[in-house]
């Protein structure tokens, strides 16, 4: 805009845009783009600098402060050239980066230009001062301006939203966001001001609203803001007028854009501010406005003073604000109430409740003595507040101190402490203020609601900005959460939806992730188990506190969510309990009192008093609040329940916020970003780090980037074509129908713009930023040029008319002057004087004769005039009828245009669907490629697995030798499995057959459809040929030779195309061979897959058998272990006996030592006893050794069997895994092969479709070629006719010239006669009179001829113009047909390789046409018969298609059943995965237990060593026993008793062995039963497998059984381990028993020593006993060795278990990985299969429908083309006739010119005769009398010529009648065409271009028809004129003859 245009903004211009001079100075400042840059700075973020040098990736620069810095090269950012200084749209910056945006805003802010565009949204910086940019002058200047036509402003954003609402018919919203103190409220007020100014309702509405002491609606909308600000705004740390509530103002408009109504929604009033403020803040403005003493009557009414410090609720912070005048604001608030229609009672109620809240804060309470209850400490303030609220003061105090609480069904009076009372007062004050505020909003909405119709709205959102204070509580969390949601909405709209729009429209676009997703923080707050959810949960628990809430927050989110952190508490600051990372920064929150704030409880006793208040407003506020009393009564009376009062603050806020977001999503948003320049509220100062932080958080840079990279402007194709066609009308011709998209493409490609700045979508054209503005400028410039040209032409035409009048005046004056001069020259002649004297006296007979002749001539002229009038009336009637027919045709054309538009819309819809389907196909192809890659990987794995499988087969052969015992069971189960596999194979074969049948049916279906299409094509072509033959029989008779020539040309083209056809057939054969090869490969793959499946099933059976064997061995091991335990118990008993005996032996040895000198008798007795004792001991030792040997053998056997079975299981598991992998790979290969086959089938179908389309095109080209040939023939015939007519006209012209020469000679003879009659005065007088009369008549005739000449010249010019136009059209038609023929031949040459066969068919059709010319009726009947046959075939094919559809549905049902079974197997697979995970945990437990067992083993080793040492000590003691033989006698009796006991113990051991054997037998029986049960279960499982009929189920079952076996084996190992630990414990007990027995034996030896002294006789026996004891020692040593062997075996077993555990862990990991892999593959394959099946079916159906409709439309379009060609032929005929008439006209004009020339010569001769002529006339009168007879003869000849000319005129009239007949024929043809076009209405969807060309041709024909009618009218008028002229000439000739 220039300075003159900026003058419209008045004083605001300098704050919106700098002057041209200042801008020019700024742009011409010195600037070096290579050195000017930005460098980072610690304090200022970025500073301007100049580059001094560059060294090794470092840059040395000098800042503008003179400081030299060295930075990395990638940290240096270029400055923009000076032309971009203070640019209004930052998206236009050359170098877009953070410092460029920052300094642009900073420089504009320094110049007080606070508004700046940033791509699609606007950025505004708070100026902290008043600027004159919002007055009415600025509003008027911005009204109706485009964004690019005016400087940035909030008014421009508002006007754009208003215009979008009117043009797009869509609701709009303006989101004004920013941090607290950024200026949101001011901008909101300006937006409302703008809408109220520009869209005000009419005068009637204003008068109506002005009634009842109210303002107009726009005034009420504006005044709602100060009323709400007084009660909802307050001073905060960052803002003196901060909105402490959010509001969404909806301004409703009518259909014409007039203001209709408005409403306001509010969110989250900060009610805690009513009772508490920080030091630097203050309460809501209304309190201080009331206390300003501007209205003293208010202070008296409210019983308050004007000192705020007298009231605790309003004096906790500051009480005054420098920038706010409370007294003036009070008057504004009061007047706003009046404008909004508040009654005086309502105003008084609002003020009273506000004053009562102030008194509430002054109420004092104290604690009763010796009680915790509170009592009032004075009642003055309570009395005041109760008075203002309409309550009883005593009831109020009682309700506060002793509220009634419902306990069960009874009410109890509860005592309150002082703290509780104060809290209750605060809660009541907050509730009263909040409800009063909400009531005010409702009341204002009721005022703003009008009954006028409303259609659209513009919403303005002003909500509390992001807040980070020193003390952040629950209110700050809610506010910040709201801002987080709004920022997320902005990000989603700007970055996600914008890019999704590009994808949806098919524009090539790479998705850009701007990293602006805030969903994590939002989920942390609002999702289940988020902060709000935990707060709600804690509010429901009665014993919950703030600390429990904190603990739950920490447990659920600390360390788990990145946005939740633990704060760092700093001394001197408020305590914080948790921190949240918001988009605008990290905020520390204090949770004290959150539970109470969320629940917001009220004293129900006081609330009940409120409901009964005498103040109407107070009772209204709490009428809907449900207390315990009202809740009970409500149940019986049907009143409102208490549920609403239980809704928490957080839940209510989230509900309102969700409603707001829903409303915003339904509108078109416009964003305004408000920025805080500094924290000090200093005008003109910008804090770079603060502003930079806000820009980063608000996504300003990202918004600019996507605006630059993306396409922010988009227009529908139809709208763009309609609006911008004026830029180049030639690109989109007026008479043609062109698709909107194609027209847009042509238009844009023809314009001189950057073609990379726009993209074409499916439905819209997309523009980069700035291009649409450039197009608008081009359009405005074009309009101005067009209007200027029109004005110039109009002025020129007016001046030409004026000039013509001036020339006419000049010519008239010249004629008058010439006549006067001639008269003056002859008036003094004697003869003239005599003539003047004699003329009045002469009354001769000549005059009478002349009068008679004149009368006769008048009669003739009158008759001709009547005839011409009758002829004219007839022609006028015909013209009226023709005009009527023309109008009818135009109406029909308009209807057809509407139908074509509908067809175009349907075609656009089909194109959209096609594009969507193509996208789906592309996606499916990508998935197919991924599957092929996976297939390649799986084939590689398959090869590896095959190698491993060969190795495993060898291992299996080795294992089969060890499994001879279970071979019988194996064979039995194998037979069963074989049966199952055979059945499964049978099922697979059935499925394969079904698939083959399905494919065959599909192919048959496709073939049937193709045949049907071919037959339909034949029917259509035959019907077309029939119509053509019926219409062109007459034409074909005269053009047989032309057709023969065309046929020869086509035959040559046919021979060319036949070779190409052979090539295409060979390629098709190659494709079919490839198809057969692929089918064979597919069959081989299926056979391999079946073989692999059978192998897998065999391996699975083998694994099951091995698992059964393992179970049996494990059961057997358990039985052996039980036997081993029994043996151990028996051995323990024997050991106990042995220890007793050894103890007795020691006692005997001691006694023997004491009785050393015993007798030999005693010695012998001792020997006998010793021998018996030794025998018993040997028996016992042998029994124990035998038991130990058997136990060791069993253990070893068990360990070996366990190891072997474990290895077998491992091998089988590996084999099974490999086979499963192979199976999955084969399945994937099978799927790939099937997909390839489907693709090949699709490709073949597409090729067939392409061939059919090309054949159709060849037919069309052939038809067009024939039409072009016929038109050329017509041109040649017309040319010959015109030549003959031209010759005839030339002959006529020569005759007319001869006639004119005769007339001239007659005139000369007359003049000679007059010279001869000089003497005869009377004759001379007669001659003079005759000459005078002739002069007058000649002059009259001259005038008439001049007029006729002018008319004829004009008509000639018109006819020449028409003729030139016709000639140009003929040339255009000729060139068009020639170029079309050339193009068509070129296209035929290009497509000849595919169209030979169709061309041959076309040639045959041509020959058939030539043959049918003679026998048309026979052909007609034959065609009808063929059509009937074809209809029968169509019905058959339809029946076949229906049967195929039925089979397809059955197959789909089978497929659905298989899918269901597969999903069941998937669920079982998931359960097996869970069990595998539980097994892994058990493995870890086993590992720990194993480590503990190793520790126990070490302890056992140490104890074993101790036992060996003790045994050596015992042997030494027994060696000394020989001295104690005497004492052995005493012990003998005891030993016998002990022997008996030992025998009984042995018997018990034998009994226990028998018992254990019985247990073994029972266990074997149970094992057999279990085995039978397992077999039965296996049989049931087999039956289930038979029912399942699927391969995946077997894989999952095998995995499940293997996992179960693993769990059981691990459990068995664990149990064995536990048993071993028990054995070791028992061994420890036995060792302790042995020690104890050794001690007792020592005592016995001491006692026996005394006996040995008495039995020295038995010393020899004692010696033998000593030897026996040595043998016992050897036996003990052997036992020790056995124990060591057992320990070693235990070690081996532990090692074996460890190996098996590791193998099991590895297998478990592999199994889990494979299970996960299979699960993921299965799920992905299932999803892909479902999608592909659904997409495939949809695609097939839609493609078939589209192809069918396309073919039908093409056929109909071809018919329309032929009809249009016929019309073109008729048009050419009409043009020939018009050309003929034009030539006739030229000839007539030439004759008229010659006649006029000769007439002029005669007049000159007559005028210049004078005296000489009179003398000559007198001399030659006699000569002329002689020549008169000859002249009469010549006159007779001229009469004959006249008759000839009349005959020619009759011929011309006949020719015009023929033209009329041609017109009627053309009209009939048009009528037929209209009928055909009506029949083609619904079938022209895929024939847009052809239909468009047809329509354009039709319009041209219609236009030419009109021109032909005009030319016919002109020709008729010319014929009439020629007749009139001929009559005049004949009359004159007769006159001359008579004279």
UniProtKB/Swiss-Prot annotation:
GO biological process: adult heart development; ATP metabolic process; atrial cardiac muscle tissue morphogenesis; cardiac muscle cell development; cardiac muscle contraction; cardiac muscle hypertrophy in response to stress; in utero embryonic development; muscle contraction
Gene name per UniProt: MYH6
Record's comment describing the protein's domains: The rodlike tail sequence is highly repetitive, showing cycles of a 28-residue repeat pattern composed of 4 heptapeptides, characteristic for alpha-helical coiled coils. Limited proteolysis of myosin heavy chain produces 1 light meromyosin (LMM) and 1 heavy meromyosin (HMM). HMM can be further cleaved into 2 globular subfragments (S1) and 1 rod-shaped subfragment (S2).
Listed GO MF terms: actin filament binding; ATP binding; calmodulin binding; microfilament motor activity; myosin phosphatase activity; protein kinase binding
Pathology noted in the entry: Atrial septal defect 3: A congenital heart malformation characterized by incomplete closure of the wall between the atria resulting in blood flow from the left to the right atria. Cardiomyopathy, familial hypertrophic, 14: A hereditary heart disorder characterized by ventricular hypertrophy, which is usually asymmetric and often involves the interventricular septum. The symptoms include dyspnea, syncope, collapse, palpitations, and chest pain. They can be readily provoked by exercise. The disorder has inter- and intrafamilial variability ranging from benign to malignant forms with high risk of cardiac failure and sudden cardiac death.
Compositionally skewed regions (Basic and acidic residues) per UniProt: 1826-1837, 1925-1939
Protein's name in the database: Myosin-6
Organism of origin: Homo sapiens (Human)
Modified residues (Phosphoserine): 417, 1139, 1271, 1309, 1512
List of residues binding ATP: 178-185
One Pfam match: Myosin_N
Location(s), subcellular: Cytoplasm, Myofibril
């Amino acid at each position: 805009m220039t300075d003159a245009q900026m003058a419209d903004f008045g004083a605001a211009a300098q704050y919106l845009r700098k002057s041209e001079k200042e801008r020019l100075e700024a742009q011409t400042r010195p600037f070096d783009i290579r050195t000017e840059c930005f460098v980072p700075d610690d304090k200022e973020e970025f500073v301007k600098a100049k580059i001094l040098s560059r060294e090794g990736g470092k840059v040395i620069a000098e800042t503008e402060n003179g400081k030299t810095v060295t930075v990395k090269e990638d940290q240096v950012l270029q400055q923009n050239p000076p032309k971009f200084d203070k640019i209004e749209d930052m998206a236009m910056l050359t170098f877009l980066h953070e410092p460029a945006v920052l300094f642009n805003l900073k420089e504009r802010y320094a110049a007080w230009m606070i508004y700046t565009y940033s791509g699609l949204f606007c950025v505004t910086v708070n100026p902290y001062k008043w600027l004159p940019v919002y007055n009415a002058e600025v509003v008027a200047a911005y009204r109706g301006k485009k964004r690019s036509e005016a400087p940035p402003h909030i008014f421009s954003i508002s006007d754009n939203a208003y215009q979008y609402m009117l043009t797009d018919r869509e609701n709009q919203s303006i989101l004004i966001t920013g941090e607290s103190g950024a200026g949101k409220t001011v901008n909101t007020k300006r937006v409302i001001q703008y809408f109220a100014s520009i869209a005000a309702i009419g005068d009637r509405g204003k008068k109506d609203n002005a009634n009842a002491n109210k303002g107009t609606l726009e005034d009420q909308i504006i005044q709602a803001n100060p009323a709400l600000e007084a009660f909802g705004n307050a001073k905060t740390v960052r803002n003196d007028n901060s909105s402490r509530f959010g509001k969404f103002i909806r301004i409703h408009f009518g259909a014409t854009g007039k203001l209709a109504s408005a409403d306001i929604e509010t969110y989250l009033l900060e009610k805690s501010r009513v009772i508490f403020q920080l030091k630097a803040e203050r309460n809501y403005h209304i309190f201080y406005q009331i206390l300003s003493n501007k209205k003293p009557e208010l202070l008296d009414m409210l019983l308050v003073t004007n000192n705020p410090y007298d009231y605790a609720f309003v004096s906790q912070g500051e009480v005054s604000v420098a920038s706010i005048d409370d007294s003036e604001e009070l008057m504004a608030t009061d007047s706003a109430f009046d404008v909004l229609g508040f009654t005086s009672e309502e105003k008084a109620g609002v003020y009273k409740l506000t004053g009562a809240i102030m008194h509430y804060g002054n109420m004092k309470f104290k604690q009763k003595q010796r009680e915790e209850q509170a009592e009032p400490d004075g009642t003055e303030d309570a009395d005041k507040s109760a008075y203002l609220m309409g309550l009883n003061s005593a009831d109020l105090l009682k309700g506060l101190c002793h509220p009634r609480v419902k306990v069960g069904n009874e009410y109890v009076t509860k005592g309150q402490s002082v703290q509780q009372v104060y809290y209750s007062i605060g809660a009541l004050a907050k509730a009263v203020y909040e409800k009063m505020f909400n009531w005010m909003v409702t009341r204002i909405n009721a005022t703003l609601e009008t009954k006028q119709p409303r259609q659209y709205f513009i919403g303005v959102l002003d909500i509390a900005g992001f807040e980070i204070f020193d003390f952040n509580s629950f209110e700050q969390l809610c506010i910040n959460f709201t801002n987080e949601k709004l920022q997320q909405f902005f990000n989603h709209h700007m970055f996600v939806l914008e890019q999704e729009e590009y994808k949806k429209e098919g524009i090539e676009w790479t998705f850009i992730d701007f990293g602006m997703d805030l969903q994590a923080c939002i989920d942390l707050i609002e999702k289940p188990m988020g902060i709000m959810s935990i707060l709600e949960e804690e509010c429901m628990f009665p014993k919950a506190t703030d600390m429990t809430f904190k603990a739950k927050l920490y447990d659920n989110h600390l360390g788990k969510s990145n946005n939740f952190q633990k704060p760092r508490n700093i001394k001197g600051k408020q305590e914080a309990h948790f921190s949240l990372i918001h988009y605008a920064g990290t905020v520390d929150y204090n949770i004290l009192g959150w539970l109470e704030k969320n629940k917001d409880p009220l004293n129900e006793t006081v609330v009940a008093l409120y409901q009964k208040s005498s103040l109407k407003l107070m009772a209204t506020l709490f009428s809907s609040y449900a207390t315990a009393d009202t809740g009970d009564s409500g149940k019986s009376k049907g009143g409102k329940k208490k549920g609403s009062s239980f809704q928490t603050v957080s839940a209510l806020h989230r509900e309102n916020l969700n409603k707001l977001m829903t409303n915003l999503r339904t509108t078109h948003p416009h964003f305004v970003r408000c920025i805080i320049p500094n924290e000090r509220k200093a005008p003109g100062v910008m804090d770079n780090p603060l502003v930079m932080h806000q820009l980063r958080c608000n996504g300003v840079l990202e918004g600019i980037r996507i605006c630059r990279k993306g396409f922010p402007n988009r227009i529908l194709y139809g709208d763009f074509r309609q609006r911008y066609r004026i830029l180049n009308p030639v690109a989109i011709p007026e008479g043609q129908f062109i698709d909107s998209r194609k027209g847009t493409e042509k238009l844009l490609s023809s314009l001189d713009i950057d073609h990379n700045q726009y993209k074409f979508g499916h439905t819209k054209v997309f523009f980069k930023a700035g291009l649409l503005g450039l197009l608008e400028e081009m359009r405005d410039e074009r309009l101005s040029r067009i209007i200027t040209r029109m004005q110039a032409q109009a002025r020129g035409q007016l001046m030409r008319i004026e000039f013509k009048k001036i020339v006419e005046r000049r010519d008239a004056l010249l004629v008058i002057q010439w006549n006067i001069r001639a008269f003056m020259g002859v008036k003094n002649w004697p003869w003239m004087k005599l003539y003047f004297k004699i003329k009045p006296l002469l009354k001769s007979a000549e005059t009478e004769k002349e009068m008679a002749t004149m009368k006769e001539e008048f009669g003739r002229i009158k008759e001709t005039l009547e005839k011409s009038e009758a002829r004219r009336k007839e022609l006028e009637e015909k013209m009226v009828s023709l005009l009527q027919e023309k109008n009818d045709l135009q109406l029909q054309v308009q209807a057809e245009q509407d139908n074509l538009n509908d067809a175009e819309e349907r075609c656009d819809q089909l194109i959209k669907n096609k594009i969507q389907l193509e996208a789906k196909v592309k996606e499916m192809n990508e998935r197919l490629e991924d599957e092929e890659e996976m297939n390649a990987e799986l084939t590689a794995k398959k090869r590896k697995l095959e190698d491993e499988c060969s190795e495993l087969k060898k291992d299996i052969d080795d294992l089969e030798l060890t499994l001879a015992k279970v071979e019988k069971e194996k064979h039995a189960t194998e037979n069963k499995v074989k049966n199952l596999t055979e059945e499964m194979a049978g099922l697979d074969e059935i499925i394969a057959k079904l698939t083959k049948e399905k494919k065959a049916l599909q192919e048959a279906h496709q073939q049937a459809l193709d045949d049907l299409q071919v037959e339909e094509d034949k029917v259509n072509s035959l019907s077309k040929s029939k119509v053509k033959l019926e219409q062109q029989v007459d034409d074909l008779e005269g053009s047989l030779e032309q057709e023969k020539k065309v046929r020869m040309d086509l035959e040559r083209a046919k021979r060319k195309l036949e070779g190409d056809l052979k090539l295409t057939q060979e390629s098709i054969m190659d494709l079919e061979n490839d198809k057969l090869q692929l089918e064979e490969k597919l069959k081989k793959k299926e056979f391999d897959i079946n073989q692999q499946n059978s192998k897998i099933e065999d391996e699975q059976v083998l694994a099951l058998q091995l698992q059964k064997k393992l179970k049996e061995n494990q059961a057997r091991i358990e039985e052996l272990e039980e036997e081993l335990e029994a043996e151990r118990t028996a051995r323990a008993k024997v050991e106990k006996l042995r220890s007793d005996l050894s103890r007795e032996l020691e006692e005997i040895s001691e006694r023997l030592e004491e009785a050393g000198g015993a007798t030999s008798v005693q010695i012998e007795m001792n020997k006998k006893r010793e021998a018996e004792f030794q025998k018993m001991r040997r028996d016992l030792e042998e029994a124990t050794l035998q038991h130990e040997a058997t136990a060791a053998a069993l253990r070893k056997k068990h360990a070996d069997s366990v190891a072997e079975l474990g290895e077998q299981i491992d091998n089988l598991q590996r084999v099974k895994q490999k086979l499963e992998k192979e199976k999955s790979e084969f399945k994937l290969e099978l799927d790939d092969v099937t997909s390839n086959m489907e693709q090949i089938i699709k490709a073949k179908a597409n090729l067939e479709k392409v061939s059919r389309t090309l054949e159709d095109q060849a037919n069309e080209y052939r038809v067009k070629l024939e039409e072009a040939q016929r038109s050329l023939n017509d041109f040649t015939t017309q040319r010959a006719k015109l030549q003959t007519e031209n010759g005839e006209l030339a002959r006529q012209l020569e005759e007319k010239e001869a006639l004119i020469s005769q007339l001239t000679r007659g005139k000369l003879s007359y003049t000679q006669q007059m010279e001869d009659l000089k003497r005869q005065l009377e004759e001379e007088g007669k001659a003079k009179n005759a000459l005078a009369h002739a002069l007058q008549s000649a002059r009259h005739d001259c005038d008439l001829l001049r007029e006729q000449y002018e008319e004829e010249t004009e008509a000639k010019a018109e006819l020449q113009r028409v003729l030139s136009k016709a000639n140009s059209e003929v040339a255009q038609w000729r060139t068009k047909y020639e170029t079309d023929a050339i193009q068509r031949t070129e296209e035929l040459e290009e497509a000849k390789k595919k169209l030979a066969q169709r061309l041959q068919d076309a040639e045959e059709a041509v020959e058939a046409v030539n043959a049918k010319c003679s026998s048309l009726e026979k052909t007609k009947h034959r065609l009808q018969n063929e059509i009937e046959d074809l209809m029968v075939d169509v019905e058959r094919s339809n029946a076949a298609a229906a049967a195929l559809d039925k089979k397809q549905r059955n197959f789909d049902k089978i497929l659905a059943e298989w899918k269901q079974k597969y999903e069941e197997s998937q669920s079982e697979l998931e359960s097996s995965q869970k069990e595998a995970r539980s097994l892994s945990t058990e493995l870890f437990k086993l590992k720990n237990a194993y480590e503990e067992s190793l520790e126990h083993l070490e302890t056992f080793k140490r104890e074993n060593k101790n036992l060996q040492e003790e045994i050596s000590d015992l042997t030494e003691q027994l060696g000394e026993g020989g001295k104690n033989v005497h004492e052995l006698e005493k012990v003998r009796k005891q030993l016998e008793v002990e022997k008996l006991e030992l025998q009984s113990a042995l018997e018990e051991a034998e009994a226990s062995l028998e018992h254990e054997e019985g247990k073994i037998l029972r266990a074997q029986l149970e094992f057999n039963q279990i085995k039978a049960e397992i077999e039965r279960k296996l049989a049931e499982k087999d039956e289930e497998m038979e029912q399942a009929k699927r391969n995946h189920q077997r894989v999952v079952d095998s995995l499940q059984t293997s996992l179960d076996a693993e769990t059981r084996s691990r459990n068995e190992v664990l149990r064995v381990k536990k048993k071993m630990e028990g054995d070791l414990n028992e061994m420890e007990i036995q060792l302790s028993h042995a020690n104890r027995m050794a001690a007792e034996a020592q005592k016995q030896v001491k006692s026996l020593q005394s006996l040995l002294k008495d039995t020295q006789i038995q010393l020899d026996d004692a010696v033998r006993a000593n030897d026996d004891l040595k043998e016992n020692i050897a036996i003990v040593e052997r036992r020790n060795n056995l124990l060591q062997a057992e320990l070693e075996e235990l070690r081996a077993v532990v090692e074996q278990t460890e190996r098996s555990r590791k193998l099991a862990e590895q297998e478990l990991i592999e199994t889990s990985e494979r299970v996960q892999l299979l699960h993921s593959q299965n799920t992905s394959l299932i999803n892909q299969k479902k999608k592909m099946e659904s997409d495939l079916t949809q695609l097939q159906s839609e493609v078939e429908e589209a192809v069918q409709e396309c073919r039908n439309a093409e056929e109909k379009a071809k018919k329309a083309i032929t009809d249009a060609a016929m019309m073109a032929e008729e048009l050419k005929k009409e043009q020939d006739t018009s050309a003929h008439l034009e030539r006739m006209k030229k000839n007539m004009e030439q004759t008229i010119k010659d006649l006029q020339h000769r007439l002029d010569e005669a007049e000159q001769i007559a005028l210049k005769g004078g005296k000489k002529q009179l003398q000559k006339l007198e001399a030659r009168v006699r000569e002329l009398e002689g020549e008169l007879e000859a002249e009469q003869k010549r006159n007779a000849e001229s009469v004959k010529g006249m008759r000839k000319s009349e005959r020619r005129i009759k011929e011309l009239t006949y020719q015009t009648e023929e033209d009329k007949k041609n017109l009627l024929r053309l009209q009939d043809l048009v009528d037929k065409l209209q009928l055909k076009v009506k029949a083609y209405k619904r079938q022209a969807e895929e024939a847009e271009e052809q239909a468009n060309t047809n329509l354009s041709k039709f319009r041209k024909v219609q236009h030419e028809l009109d021109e032909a009618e005009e030319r016919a009218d002109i020709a008729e008028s010319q014929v009439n004129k020629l007749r009139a002229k001929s009559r005049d000439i004949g009359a004159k000739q007769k006159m001359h003859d008579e004279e």
